[in-house]
């Protein structure tokens, strides 16, 4: 390494960690990560505060672009995760996402370490985050990244097991991996599938996954499954379980034949397939199946079929919950149906429902149980078998429990039918056998007497069933519950019952034992075989891919590091931690001879022989000798077991001599207390004999001492557990009573942390308190009293069901042993058991799972509109807590917390208080788990402190107390910090919260996390409320006390203001900070206590400063201190950490000025301290005005060199100027006014314009202070305001000046009035909105102050000079005196103008208007009025978006772009695309000007040049629409919105430009415009109604001028539901549905407009493309959806049908020639073909077109395939038919133009066809008309004109009656209109079809009707707005009759062409002839 690198690394070590880790040099970053890893390796305490400081850094470090650095970062992360605990989970999401994104595609080492890190996150219980990340990772497009992700999931599942990694999440991810294109990914997916089979079994995996696989993959997996053995065991545990391991080992030793608890714990977790399935909704298909009609049918077969359908649907494995109450009522009736087949089907349906719904079917099961039990009377096996099966299913599925069915069983066993009684008892036996012990213990008191009574039944079957039930109870809970009842039985029955119990118990026990042994051996073998391999890859599960041997596992990345002081002494191997085999506690048999052989020379042979002696004295001597020998042994540990075995054999525990017994016990006590390790085997060998010796008063003391020694050796948990069984079964009651008394002393010595409290309490309750011996009961009471001392009152909840007398005795004992909490034990355990404390103690008290009690009805009650129902739900939760003894598990409480969270926002305050109490109760009952289970509800609880009611706040604090009792304060700190900084919380709430915190901190001696409270507490020191400040001060004192000085000094940078002085005084006594003077001076009377501190310290500071100051130079006003000189080298302004946008976001944009509040002053100080150099900020914040002037001079001198920095902190500087304006010191104010013009000149030179936020900070104050009482100050302020007007914008400045007119200061009003006159004089009246405020100025003429009246009259005179007499429109209502006064002033002004030869008032403005009207904008521009008086930023606001006409005639002049704006088209486009909103406006001005110029070019060459940029321009502007509207919604001006819309309008006014816009761009633009039309926030914006109008007009212009094909295609595509992300603002699903409905309605309106004009524009449309888009839309919907929507009257579908209908109507059969883009050969046929056929048929029937073939039998495929006739004949026929249809069109005046165009296209397509040969029977006039028409069409086609503008004459009337003989007459067809005759769309045609055949359309009535329609059409406006443009955005849709068969109503008249004079005059002439009686022949 070079010297430079070494130097760099050395220097870098001094930097903070964040700077090192983010350093630009990779070597620095690399070394930083290595150092960080070593720091974590040195941490042994998971609560070390350093871990919290570093956690957030890894998000960036693991994403490092340098591979070696990234690898080291992963090493550091692994070290961090090993050192941390589950608290590190807060960083899991962001770090895991970064690893998945950046590390999984790297080098092998990097991938391995990334996987190791993921597994450590799992170990820290961040499983959900891990799986969320994996869900994203497997969607990566790069297969190389997917394989490691799948592999790490595989490793996690393989190592931690399915208990930690939920299989359901993985099962959901696998299906998409099965079809992955990469084979490695597929192989990994298979491997994970096989691993799942090891954990949850093959059947669940098969049933869930196999149906989603391809057949080949199924076969492969089937073959692999043969090699997979179920019963996997985890090889690694999560961190919290690792802590419990020693205790788990200690408690794993049991006596007897049953399986050990450890074996149970490590056994493979039984996964219920039900939990892995997704629920299926069966209610919806059931409704559609006709079930309800079927079950009411009279025929039994129909009823059976209906129920069978339900049975079939309910056979799914998991049914979605719903309302099954009506179904169950129906089934209950059907159970008793007269037809047994129906009844059996109903019973089977109930069974299926119970199996699929489980606990959700509980209420329904209880409802139907009595009927089902009654049905047991049926003797037919076809009924009894399904009935028995259903009853058993209901119980197994958890729908019923023993407690619920007591009453129903009692009723059934008293039934008069013996079969019902016996079957009920048989079912009860089944229930008892499948229930757990706890449930039977609850219910046995009810069932035992019931069964005993049934033993006397007269029917043998009933008696046998009762015996079976009693045997089941005894088998489960033992004989104790039956003892008293057995006394009443005779010997025969007693003997029979005993035999049954013995028979069932013995057999079962043996079976269980053997099974357990086999499974244990099998699983051990499996575990051993698997343990020898480390499977890092999921693909290694597949055959032929054997994993690497475990020897390599030790080398893998992330192996555990030794940590002596951490947790249990070591950290397991991270990769594949091996589980140590449990200690063998059961001693093997060993004879005396073998013992002697093993003893060897350890004990003298004579001693052993004496121990065997029958003489007690010899035995005594031998024991004494043995004791001496043992005491002399050097290595006792190796011989412990053999010595204990010797003593147990000789003299043995049957020794009768007391002295010998005592010696034996003392020797064993000595061995157990002296040996380093005393095996549990030895305890098992001795404990029975020792417990018996406790019962003897002579040996009691030594035996108890021995038991205590055992506890010290192996832990009290193991000793207690062994004693329970011995004491319970021993015949000597003294063993029990004295053993209990020893337990009392043991609890006192060792505490309860190492005991299993649940087992101990159960033993006391079931054995001790139930004993008939008083001594035993008393000893038990003492033991429970001792437990109370450690556990507290919670123990009472577990003893509620004991007898009242015992309860009172217990209460007395509790009083003697009051709760003291956890204390240090008097004795300690030698083994590692002592380190595990988390598994015992209070937390061992049993917690109840309440998830089943949180029913949907309970949760629904929380949301009930009835407050009583909501209260009932809250009280129900309290009741559940009581029933659970206030000890609950977190399982399934997520929805409960959600319901309670909603009630915290209840309008009923009493309910909120009840909820707070309940939440506190839930927290106390749940314990530490509440922190994770509550889903952040604590933040909502804290919000309740913002209530103004004291009682509410007290309830909140009580809830916080209970919460604190459950979790530690450090878990609550993040929520408390948010609450303290919440602006909505009132002063009382903050004060109460600070007091509460102070109280909690007072009880702590050391609490590092309190440092996080320092910042919010210091902020509160500047609060307006004195109570809050006082409470915050008290809290800060406690924070400082518990945090420690080192931690405080690290965090001093976060503290400013008064709190800083307080902190420094406590941390560094005597320290004083100078800037605090300014705080005192500016904050004023904020805090009296703080002010005193500043006074007492400021004197000392000044004296000390005087000594160190240099002698001031004569004549110099600047005094430079030594400290200032020392920091001169630093930058004057530090803008490194400045974020101007964030500061401006919180600026309140007010026009009216308000004095600064103390907290605003404090914020200003804080910002100045951050950004200004120390000497500068000290001067500017000093209370001494001279220092402030000095500071300004420093800034003034540096101004040219720090202009960029000044701009960055301009808002801070302006706030300081505002502060100075509010002070009374004139010297400082004059200096400020001297500095400000220079500042604004600098800003102008930098081409910087103030932002709106900066203007809102400064201008209100400047406008208000214009009326200063010193003339000199007023003058400077006046000039400053004029300078700002020029630099900023008149349009944005004059609102502040207008606000000044409302000031209470008359001088301010005078100045503002003069400024308005100045604005009128210099800027004219073109300032948008200024004229409408002249009435305010005019009203000032009535004021008393003469100066104010004079100023108002002068301003009015200026306005009169410009406007002339028009000014009277703007003056508002005035008194006669005011009018007279103003009029006199106007006359004087007119005379004055005459003298000066300035013309007459208003003359110049009128001339300008005329010139603009006559010559366009150029003349106005040349006149100089606009260009001179309106600089760039002064563009009038109201010139946008008012109406289409206004937009068209307001082109933007070129010079309006301003001096610094863009100068050409390309530059303007760049600025629009990349500039800020303000800069974009300048670009748009140029674009508008260029467009206006190009539009006026007669040769259109300029437009042709711009066409190439049209699409790019519109695309850019479409993006700008959203941005500008978003900015305006945040409070900014709507100026940029208007410019965007105006530019778009100018673009789309030109057809060439509009046609150049591409389809994609058009879609984006239309979508954006329609969305903003619908946005309810737009009307609330500035000029919102104008913007709505502009949006409407622009939308209509787009529809008019854009490419028709693109418009149609885009709008049809927009009929689909819109993606929620496209909407401008987020909302709920319901709101999105409503929005989509409104959006589609608008799209439909647009399509209606286009469809109206289709007749005249059809040749502009690419019909092939349009039909393709309709085809795609219909195919996407599908026939099922179309049918559903047709029934629901869906508007989008109706609209598409309408467009298709219009196309078919206009083109007839020729429409089939436009299907080139539709795949007509596909199967099934495209839906569009059926609709075209239907329209052709219907329109032909309605005489709206000529049928061209057999309707409904059109062949869409190749005609040769289906038609044997030659193709030529077919083509001729088709051509003839088409010509016939065209001649019909030409014969009708309304469609003649279209017909001629069709005929023209035919002649071009078939030039050899003689069309006039078809017109032999037509009149010569008609043929001539056709010839002339074709010639005209050809001429128009050459000129590029469309049919809509074709000026053709009316066809000869006589021709209409002379169709070609080859063409069928129109009148010969039956009329069957498709739509309702009232439909506007088809009014004329249908009316014509209903007329008298003799008259037809030529009658007088028909012509009148047609004229009326034409006149209506001509009178309609050209464009109707799409949306109402006022604030009410509701759309007035016209209702459409349902008889219109799904077609959209289009209000158009297809037979009426655009109005022309010739057509109208021709009709009028015909009407005159009809009136004269000469009807034309039709």
UniProtKB/Swiss-Prot annotation:
Expressed in roots, cotyledons, rosette leaves, stems, open flowers and green siliques. InterPro entries: ARM-like, ARM-type_fold, CLASP_N_dom, HEAT_type_2, TOG, XMAP215, XMAP215_CLASP_TOG. The keyword Cell cycle applies. Changing residue 195 to K: In mor1-2; short and disordered microtubules at temperatures above 28 degrees Celsius. Signal peptide: none annotated. The keyword Disulfide bond does not apply. PANTHER family: MICROTUBULE ASSOCIATED PROTEIN XMAP215 (PTHR12609). This is Protein MOR1. The gene is MOR1.
